[in-house]
Every structure is written in structure tokens, then in C-alpha cells.
Amino acid sequence: MSSANYISDEVPPDMVSPHDHRPSKDEPLKHLDTVIALYDFPGTQSSHLPLNLGDTIHVLSKSATGWWDGVVMGNSGELQRGWFPHNYVRSVNYVQPVLKKLKDNKDLDSITAANTAANVVMPSLTNLIQKSLQESERNSPANSTRKNSVVSFASSETSMPSDSKYTQQQTNTNQNSPEYQSISLPSTRDHSTVEMQLPSQQSSISHTLTGFGIGDDEIIPMEVEEAEKLVEEYRLKYNKTVTWIPRTSTKGDIIFYCEQLDVYCESLPLILFDGEASSPNLEYPGSDVIMDPTPISVQGSQSMENVLDTREGSAAGSFDSTKRDSNVSMSTQSSGSSYHRFSRPFFSVDNLFYKHSSDIGTWNELKEQCNYILDLMLKAIKDQNRQFFSTHFSRLNKLVVALCAAVRLNQEDYIDTKYENTTRRKLKRVCASFAQIYINGILHLSVLHYSLEGFNEGRLFGYDMGKLNRSSSSSAFQSPASSLSTIRQGSDDSTRFAQKLSQDRNSEGNGDMNYINQLVYEIDNLRENVNSIVKIFLKLSANKKIKNSDYDSSDASDDEGEDRFDILPQVYPRFLVDEFNGGNWCNPFFSTKNTVLNVSGDDLKNRYHTKIIIDHSAYDSLSQYVDKIVDACENILEALDPKVQNTFYYNEMLRNERNTQILRLTYKSLYHCSAMVDLIESFDFTVFCSVKRHTGNAIDTEDESYENPSVWGDHYDSNLSFDYPVVLEFFRLKQELHDLVAKIIMATQSLTLEDPEVFKGLKEEDPLFYNREISKIPKEKAALLLSSILKEQLSFKDGGAISLNPDTLLSGYLVEIAKTTKTVLLITQQLIEERETIINYATRVMQDNFDVQLLLVERNNTSSSEKADDNSYYVGGHKKSTDVPWYLEGDDEYELLLDVKGNIKGGSKEALVSHLTHHLSLDSNFNAVFLLMFSSMMSLGELISLLIARFNIEPPEGLSYEEYNLWVSKKRNPIRLRVINIMKLLLEKNWSMSYYNEPVLRRWLTFAHSDQVQTYSLGNLLVNYLERLLRGERIYVERDPVIPNTKPPAPLTKGSSLSKKPRVMDIDYVELARQLTLREFKLYCKITKFACLAKVWGKKSGLSESIDSITQFIKASNQLTNFVGYMILRKADPKKRVQIIRYFIQVADKCRQYNNFSSMTAIISALYSSPIHRLKKTWEYMNADALSNLKNMNKLMNSSRNFNEYRDVLKFIGSEPCVPFFGVYLSDLTFVYHGNPDYLYNRTRQVNFAKRAKTSEIVSGIDRFKTTGYNFQEVPEIQKFLDAWFEKCPTIDEQYQISLNLEPREQAVGASNSNSTTNATTNIKSFKPFSLK
């Protein structure tokens, strides 16, 4: 097999490719890399290298196909060589230290080959590594930041010096040492041997073979702690303190070197300071070491000319702000960087960061600022103003730094392009010119400052800078330009610069080059290069987008992105706009606008700030705390009772015992107070924050649709998107509870204090006299002093002074906290009722402007502690059957992900299509889900291509004649039959007009006409279907519901009996229920399964179906709700309103008997809406039976338990006609869509099939109730009556105003503070209904 073949086929090479160098028998073979296996790789061919989890492999070559050639050393020393896939391993720098740390950890035993799935990252080991690294970071000492380097993963043996000498730090491969052993490796293709050099003194190969292409002069930096130990031992032995000098490394970093110890460190080692010791006896390195400019090559890095070279050893590196090269391991990153996986820098887009007025956000602005500052610097030089020159240079310094940072952050744009070398070269020139501007500018201005009196103007500007140097005149001219020539060696400007120097010298006449000429040249040079760099990046940023996928470590992105042309990376540290979560602080009322930029991250936020749903379970827990707090307060108050003080505590010893007992009881109660505070602080207010509600005068002005945010007015300017009195009252009480707990602690401690005034606040300062003239008037000044005295006395009377009576003060606080906790309990009960009302109403009316995601957010916030690791739920691949030959096994089996029950959770498109047409098994449920949901995974063209490729499956190589015949009969023929059957099912039962694509259909038709397809009986049928589709005919038509052949019941209210202006009460409630049922069922049957998918999934569904049927159904249900409410509010007399309410309760109950849950829900939604439910005087006239019936129906449709009772009722409906409540289906579809990712592990190759299966199950439930229709007779007059009223009924907002006119809002009465809370809570629910966003 040729090299080209195996590269294109992506199979492991069987021999060294022609372009590779084949080592001879006697030639040592050097490794390229050292890696560790993360998975078991069994190896199915003789050329494969079998791997076990944790094996150390030395990579000898890397093929472009992704297969690497490596060697493994066994326990007995034997070597085995072969090919293995690169995605089964990770670099030793990444994995080895973690495995070493976890070698005795029981968690490692749980990592088995069962977790292996093709092209899926192994989650168990990854999570284990992450956990280990996070623990190591938390347990690291204060100076652990020194370890943020590659060498933190090196073992102690790597850099441990010998006992006899301190200068024993060895380089990775010492060219002067012959201590190497030759090991023979068996070749993978023949019996010849190759040699591999290994250092004999190393106990582990992995300690030596780290990094790519390590040179002979590379050094291994020592750990800081080890170096500090060596320094201390050296000081104790020789009574001298060594010194460290900084050296530059080949990758542009600073590394510290000690000549005495011959040790390198990436961080500066420190010694302990001993104040009693004498002055340190410092030992300095030699001058040759200090002056040596040779860069140091550090192990694990690659040679770089400057810090702008690629970080990962190739130009294809991705951005990571914490990495300098590819060998940086995970432990070198901070906890924040290990959490965020940003592949792009942030860009200075609008409304993302709080910006300073001086911040620069665009490339053009940067260019203009640079040009402007350079002009000012020239002017300052011309005006001989040293202060202005220094000021402008400081600004230029910031601009150059911003330019360098922007180029570095944006390097992914120019790497591997024709602009890469140009960009690097011009940036070097900018830095060089910047330095020369400062040097020549300062020298020029210094000459003017010190020599102005000694030289005339002619001599002044002809002054030679060489004369300032105390060197010979022959070298005087070379000194100012030496740095220029050194920096620009080999640059394109060399000739031009030399010509300019010659011109300048000739113009001066005396051969001198002055500072100002150099300065002007450098300014022009810097200006030119900055403009060129900006021009390059303007070209590079054209048509570039900022996408969320650049920041959430996924390769899936549905957003179109934001244009970033002419936008700089964010080079300034700034706060994010409207982000109030960070570190340990989370604000529950501000949701992040940029989920990928969330500082703390939603997962971290939920991990440390678990939220609790405000439900009856939370109420029960809160009630227990309140009971314990009240009991403790009563016990303390008994001990503080003034009546028993003289009887039982008549001496100091008894009073001390009493105080001790009070302290014990108080701190016991504080424990319950603390638990209660923690509980109420964890309440989740997602529902209240996500729904807008209006109070006060806002209702008078709101007459526009709340679907249009532009008409909301000034009432919505605040970021707080709720206005609930009950919520605000809850927060007021919560703060009051906090204050009381603090006061009780101080009051309790004051019982035993000798000086109770210790807790008294500092004396307030005298008020500021803004009018000094008035303060000079004696009477005015006396009045101010008198007011201060009276105010202080008043504070004493109010109990502000602890010294009056600590018992009385503590007793008052205990009484207050007992009342406050009971009030908090009452408010919590109202919060529960309000939350249920919001969710019930929002779900029942199925408002499009209601953000259903609020329920998802609430669920995610509260259930994080209960959720298992999603990654660990998936295991890979089908189990192979032992009695099936290998050539008859399923295809792409290991690309399927299964759950513990064997259901398919996901997989690649190819694997899913292979399972769809499997030759050994028929999974009908899987087929039905796939054919319904395939458009969300792939286009019709992709599906047909995969099916055709499946039909034309090729036999594997190496089959005998008998095996080939068996393969044809047992595998190929069944697969072909399955392919044709799948195509037939798609056209017959799962076709949507959204799929119509004429080129694809014609290609499909060509395939159907082929001889191979026509050999099957279904071939002609397939051709017929495709030709009909191309002619515009419909093949798939939903069946009409079956209506029984029996005679329908006669209408109880005939159209002829109704007057020209009928009233609703003229229609019999039974007949109205029938007519409503017919209307709802007709609209329900128009809803297709494809419309449901398009409604919830949107563009991701891959459908262009109309959702008008769903819109009309929701509109009709909401019109019925408005109709019922308005019919009640039209009556001014409360008793007549009661008659209408009783009538509609009967209608709703009859709808329930007809299984018309849609109309029933719409009616009870109207009766429980705020305009109707707030009419207390009206509800007082209702009889108990009607109220009980209404409560039962409301309980049936209660969403607090996910409609469990309603779902149970639906299960027992067989062949009877039914109109289900569509809002439940919408909620379920929305939860599945938003609560599950489209792809597993954020990889587009791994389709989340389980999400599609759940969606298909819900949609199938919708179609279930379309089969049987209602045998009722339609009354056109009643239908026209309903149509007329439905169109002109006012909205719920307008109805609320009518409700206020009928029964005005009650005002809370109560002047005292003790009653204000009670009055507020009893009337807290008298406000306007919410409008849904």
C-alpha cells in the first residue's frame, strides 16, 4: 500500500512512508515525544501497538493520518513497537504527575476501558485529573505561584543534585557524557533492529523524554523549593550566600542562574530572613557569567526568536492567555483559566466592558492616536520643552504597549498567512524606534539643558553626540547608531537608513549626525510601521466574526456572530457590563447577558450557592426553625422576667448563673436563626425576576400590547425586572431579621460586661455649618446645640443606650425576633402561592411572550447538587457478539454512545445511519425517531448520500470466496433492503414539504432507477413516489379523525331559539361546552408534528413549516379566557356576577366530562386571573359546592407538580375523543430543547440522539388524540356568537381596570409600626396582574 493511499484512507501505515527517513540498523533512533495512554487500544492488526491505560509510549514518528509510530517498554524490559491513534494519548507533561499522585487512589481503579468511545474525550480520567489539579492548587503554599511552569510536573529525581557536589544539575542530554545504552527495537515489518538511545542514569524514561525535539544543550530548571534547600545547605556549609542572575531563555522568558550551584530556576528562589544574624556574606558570580548574553534553551520549549513566535511549536496554535507554548500543562493555569477555555481573546466591542474615556477600541483609533502623539513630540522637540516631551512619550509608551498586546492577542489572524513575517518584522521596528526616540530625545534635550550657555545656535544644532561619550573620536560617530545597526541587521531599511545618514552628514558639512535628525527619522519610521501594521490587521479582520463557540470550548455555534472589523482585542483590564457575579458573590436578581463571559460561571455559581425552590417543602423547613426560635425566646424571656429577679436571683452568684444559662439558650437559638437565615437566603426568585408586574399608576397608562418593549415606558428602566410588593416585603423582613440577630448578640454579651457602653457607637460629629454668618448669631448657635442635646436624650429614651437596662433591651429584641420570624413565615406562604399563581397562569394561557426558560433556570439553579455527572452517564459502543464473524459485525459501532439501559444516547451521523440500516437488528423505535428528527441533525442531501453510501457498501479486504458469499447474503443484501425500506418510510409517513429540494430529489431518483435498486420489489414504488414529488403532488397526508356512525345528540339550544342579541346565559351550559369542544378539536387537529418542531426548535429543526396552526390554537384559548372574564366584569351587581361565575364553572365541569381539557383550563384560568380573583365581595356570595368544584379542577391543572394529576388522567383515556391541554406539550418540548445540548461533549460529531428521542415521544403524544373525533352537531348561531365576542373582548390589562372600578383596591390602615407589617401582609396581594415578557 502506498503512502498516498494510507494517508487518504486514514489507516495506520504499515511501513515507513517514502518521504520519511528509514533508520539503518546501526543508526540510533531518536524519539519525538513521550505520551501516556488515556484509553485501552486493543489493536486489531499486526502493525498496531496495543495500549493499556497508563502506558508510557515513546513516539518515533507522526503520520499525517493521525497514526503515530511508538514503542512501549514492558515490565520485563522487552520493547514493542507499532502504530497507535494519536487521540488515545496525551503528553506526559499533562498526565504523568497526576497519575503518579493518584497511583494509590481508589478512583483510578474505576477508570476502565468501558468508558472508551471513539473520538470522544474520556470523561472519567479527565474529571479525575481536573479534580486532582484543583486540590493541588488549593493545598499549595503561599509561594505556589512560582510553580506555574512546565517544570512543576517534573519529578524530584529530574533535578536532584548528588550528595558530593552542588553543581550536579544535568542537562537533558549531556553531549560530554557517553553514558548511554543501546536498546534493540524489533521492527514492525521485518526482523531487523533499530537502536534507541536512553540515558542510563535515569530511572524512568519519561523523566528524560519530555518535549519535542529536545536539543543537546537544553537544561531542566530546578524546582524552587529544591533550589532554596540547596542555597540553605550551601550557606550552612560555606557560610556564604549565593546570588542569582537573570538570563534570557530561547522562548523569551527570564530564567535565573546560580554559578555556585550551577542551577537554573524559572522563579527566583528566596531565603529566610534572620534579623539576628549578621549581614549576609554574598558570593557573586564571575564577570564572564554576568556578561554572557547567550540565551538558555529550556527543556520542553522550542527555539524562538522573540516572544511573538508561536506558542505551540507550530503556527496553528490557538489562543490561551495562560500559555506560552504547547507544553504548558493544566496545573500551570489558574483555577479561572482551567475553568474557562477561551480560544479567542475578548474584543473591545460595545456594551461588553466598562471603558475608560482614554481606552482605544479600534485599529484606526490606535493609528490616529499614535500619529497625533508623534506630531506632539516633534513639536515638543522643536519648542525645546522637555516636560511636554516626557508627557507625550509616556502616552506613546501606552500606545506601543497596547499595539504589542493587540498583535499578540490577535496572532491567530496572521499566523500561517502571508502577513506573518511582515507583522513580526514591523513590530520589531516599532519597538526599536520607540527605544531610539526616547534615547535621542533625552540626549538632545539634555544637551540643550546643560550646554545652552556654552554654545551658539550654529554649534548647538551641529553638536555631535559622539563628543558626549568619553571615547576616541574615531568611534564617536558609531556609538549613536550602533544600536540601530544591531537591531536592524538584515532589515529592508538598512540601505535606506545608510543613505539618509550619508545625506545628513553631507548636509552638516562636518560629517556629524546630530540627535534631532535621528529623532525625526525614528519618529517617521515608527509612524510608517504602525500604519502598516494597522493596515494589515484591517485586512485580516474583514469579514471576521465574534462567536460564542470561541469562548465555550465547543465547535458548535448557531449564532451568526458579531462583526469585529477594525476592532481591537480588549487590552485593558476592565469590568464586564452588567455582570454582578464574581468569586463568592452572586446576585440573584441580575442574570448574566453573556453566559460565556460569566466571571464565576453558572456551574461554580450553583455549586457554592445552592438555590431552593420556594415551595411547601421549604415552608415546612422554615416552620421548624421558627418554632425552635420561638421556644428558645420564650425560655430566655422566662429567665429575664422582672417578677422573678428578686425572688430567684437575689445575689451576684445567682445572677451570674442566670446569665450563663441565658448565654447558653441564646447561642442555641442563634444556631436556629443562622440556619433560618441560610434557608431564606437560598430562596430562588427566578420566577419573580423574569415576569414583569405593574403597580401604582402604571396601570392607568398601559394600554399597549406588552409584547412591544418600546411602549413599556420609564417604569422598566431599572435592571430589576420585578415589582412585587410581597417580594419587597420579604426582603425588608429578611434585613430586619439580620439586624435583630446582631442586636441580640450584642445585648446578650452586655449582660456580663462591666462597661455596657462598649458597644455604643462613636459620637456623631457636629453638623457642618454651611452658613457661617448664621452660626455667628448666638441664638441660632444655641438653638442648634439644644437640638443636639434633645436628640441625644430622645435616643436614650428609645433604648439606644445599652447601659439603661440590659435585661429590658434583650427582652425587647427577643420579642421582636419572635414576631419577625412568624411574619417571615407568613410572607413565605404568600410567596409560594404567588409563585404557583404565576406559573399556573403563564402555562395555561401559553403566552408567546412568556420566557419559558425561567423554569429551566430555576430548575438548574436548584438541582445542581442532585445532578450526576452527565459525562459519566454515557458509555461507548455495542458489545460484540462472540458467535458473529468479524466481517459480519456492525459498522461504526464504537461511535455510538449508549446509556446503562442500552438505549442510544448519541453518536456520529455515520454511526446513526449505520444503526438505522443495521443488518442484524431492527430497532423500530429508533427508526421512527430518526425519520422524524433527522432534519435537526443533517440535511436531506446528507441523509440520502449516507443511505446511498450504505447501499453501496464495500466488502472488507482479505475475505475468502466463502466468506465473501456469506458477507453478501448476511450483511450486504439485508443492508440494501433496509436502505430501500427507510427511503419508503420517509416518503410515505415522514415527508414534509420543507424537505423539497429538486436537485437532491433528482439525484435520489437516479439512484432509484439503478439496476441494483430495481432488483427489489420496492424499487418501482420508490420511483413512483419520487416522480410524484417532483410533479408537486403530496404523498404524506395526515388522516382525518374517525367519528362514530351513531346519530349525534340533538342541540339543547337551537339557533332559532336565540334572539338577535343573545346573552351568554341564553345558551345552555351543556351546549356551550359542546360547541367549545368542537371549536377546540377542529383547531387542535390542524397542528402537525412538524409545526410543533418548528415552533420550539426554530431554525435548528431544519424545517420551514408554518406555525400558524399553533398560533391560532393558542389565540383561541386566550380569547376564551378573556371572554369568560369580560362576561363576569360586565355585570355591575355582585350577585349577577356570581351567576355568571357559577354558569362558567358548570361549563368547565362539562368540558372536563367531554375530555376537553383545553377549554376547561382556559375557563378556570379566567376565574383565577387577578381581575376576577380579587373581587372579594363577589366571591363571598359563592356557594360551597361551586367553589369546591372549581378548586378540584384547578388542582387537576396545577403545574406545581408538573401536572402530575392531569398526566395520570390522560393515561387512562383510550379511544375516547379528547382535546388535551396544549400548554403541557409546549412546556415539555421547551424543557427538552433548552435543557439538553444539541451535541454531546460540545462536539458536533457527537449528535445528542436522546434529546431527539424525547422530543419525538412528546410529539407522538400530540398525534395520539387526533384519531377519534366528537359526535356533536355544530350550531352555527352559537359559533357566530362566540366569534363576535372573542374578537372584541378586552385584554386582561383592560379588564383589571374594570375590576378596580367595580371593587377599588383596599388601603392598609394602621399607624403604629407594630401593625404596619400585619396590614401590609394581609393586603399584599391587592395589585395588578403580571404581564408576561
Swiss-Prot record:
PROSITE patterns: RASGEF (PS00720), RASGEF_CAT (PS50009), RASGEF_NTER (PS50212), SH3 (PS50002). InterPro entries: Ras-like_GEF (IPR008937), Ras-like_Gua-exchang_fac_N (IPR000651), Ras_G-nucl-exch_fac_CS (IPR019804), Ras_GEF_dom_sf (IPR023578), RASGEF_cat_dom (IPR001895), RASGEF_cat_dom_sf (IPR036964), SH3-like_dom_sf (IPR036028), SH3_domain (IPR001452). Pfam families: RasGEF, RasGEF_N, SH3_1. Residues 133-166, 177-187, 194-206 have a biased composition (Polar residues). Residues 1068-1305 form the Ras-GEF domain. Residues 17-27 have a biased composition (Basic and acidic residues). Residues 167-176, 474-485 have a biased composition (Low complexity). PANTHER family: CELL DIVISION CONTROL PROTEIN 25, GUANINE NUCLEOTIDE EXCHANGE FACTOR. It comes from the Eukaryota. GO terms for biological process: cAMP-mediated signaling; cell division; cellular response to glucose stimulus; cellular response to starvation; filamentous growth; filamentous growth of a population of unicellular organisms in response to biotic stimulus; filamentous growth of a population of unicellular organisms in response to starvation; Ras protein signal transduction. Residues 30-94 form the SH3 domain. It comes from Candida albicans (strain SC5314 / ATCC MYA-2876) (Yeast). The gene is CDC25. SMART domains: RasGEF, RasGEFN, SH3. Promotes the exchange of Ras-bound GDP by GTP. This protein positively controls the level of cellular cAMP at start, the stage at which the yeast cell division cycle is triggered. One of its GO terms (molecular function) is guanyl-nucleotide exchange factor activity. This is Cell division control protein 25. GO terms for cellular component: plasma membrane. SUPFAM superfamilies: Ras GEF, SH3-domain. Residues 900-1034 form the N-terminal Ras-GEF domain. Keywords: Cell cycle, Cell division, Guanine-nucleotide releasing factor, Mitosis, SH3 domain. Residues 1-27, 133-206, 474-497 are annotated as: Disordered.
